[in-house]
Amino acid sequence: MIKFALALTLCLAGASLSLAQHNPQWWGNRNTIVHLFEWKWSDIAEECETFLAPRGFAGVQVSPVNENIISAGRPWWERYQPISYKLTTRSGNEEEFADMVRRCNDVGIRIYVDVLLNHMSGDFDGVAVGTAGTEAEPSKKSFPGVPYTAQDFHPSCEITDWNNRFQVQECELVGLKDLNQHSDYVRSKLIEFLDHLIELGVAGFRVDAAKHMAAEDLEYIYGSLSNLNIEHGFPHNARPFIFQEVIDHGHETVSREEYNQLGAVTEFRFSEEIGKAFRGNNALKWLQSWGTDWGFLNSEQALTFVDNHDNQRDQGSVLNYKSPKQYKMATAFHLAYPYGISRVMSSFAFDDHDTPPPQDAQENIISPEFDEDGACVNGWICEHRWRQIYAMVGFKNAVRDTELTGWWDNGDNQISFCRGNKGFLAVNNNLYDLSQELNTCLPAGEYCDVISGSLIDGACTGKSVTVNEYGYGYIHIGSDDFDGVLALHVNAKV
């Protein structure tokens, strides 16, 4: 009986711990993460203070913080080839990183670090030099900056069969030297690295290539981490938020269900299906059942996105900034529909898969510059600064904890729905106008459409909709309008 009670206690403690790792530790009603891909730490700090906090963003996913290999031309993916765990990259050094985390936390913006626990750098001719000046010999699995030697890695092999668990989790992903996370020493170095970031005030981690590591090894690592730092405004005993990259199309041996109890999981099916719908390959009317009925994870386990830094570069159904009208409609739906832990993308312009972030002649990442409307102009796309997207972050905050009600569709690609009595969204992806009296579920009054304009000093700079005493309003979205979506909420009442 005593053994049973002890086992039950340990089981419940483990369940409680994993549940806590699904909590993003947001401030107030904020509930959207933005991925400021390849931004410098000093620029993120300023963005937190001047743009993200005033517009209600909840957190920032940042690029990998550890020292990486220097590759010719400086492609973005060099950040995913670690040399050591020193906090020096093209985004800045440890002092600048710590300053950024502190300043963002001070204004209620949480920081989530993209971390590389699966591997170190791939092969390199001769001695490689990292962004902190550390030397390594990846071909010999020698990384003295940690230090790691060949005994800390799995034997080299290639992944040729994605249904072979051994290959997926112990062979080398695209030639990257595969760490042995079952080793006590490797575990200790990974935990030390993550704990240092927690000490500096981060709120959690995006775990790159999680499916390439055994779930039981990750469970041990996550469970060994320190609680979040109360000096950065986190409550006592708060656990780091974990979201894991697991690409699961439903037909491979290693599945997302092995990881979703340890933390949230990136729901790639969401990205693929929302792209198909707004590209016109699936009628929007079917989105009424969006979520688990589509084979997605439970809402609290799913990290959702229209595109990410990887799949936006691939051919296929995934939308990106190069299809702006459809991308804005998809993002509006993403942020309005009550499903998932939402993340929006902030990209830089690219012509091919390897395009580096905007940089100067010395290959230093340059800071974003803005026009008079606040949009980025020097190679940075900054989707998060598009009014149609940051306005929907405000919409999502305004309707938090409300249910989806009042669904309407025309049997095809025109839809609308309410979020309780606090918000209303309408979308037109047909080649003809949407012009109809629709139930907005809102209290009577005049509302500013936050997609086409902003509410400034009590006046709307875009479309406005008058809602009658029954909650109905006349909605018009022309097929040729600049935006194919309209959004109203209680905080945008004129």
Curated annotation (Swiss-Prot):
Modified-residue entries (Pyrrolidone carboxylic acid), positions: Q21
EC? Answer: 3.2.1.1
Tell me, what is one Gene Ontology molecular-function annotation carried by this entry?
Answer: alpha-amylase activity
Pfam annotation, one family: Alpha-amylase_C
Q: Active site at which residues?
A: D208 (nucleophile), E245 (proton donor)
Supply one GO CC term from the record.
Answer: extracellular region
Which N-terminal residues, if any, form the signal peptide?
A: 1-20
GO BP terms: carbohydrate metabolic process
Protein name (record): Alpha-amylase-related protein
Q: Which residues bind chloride?
A: R206, N308, R343
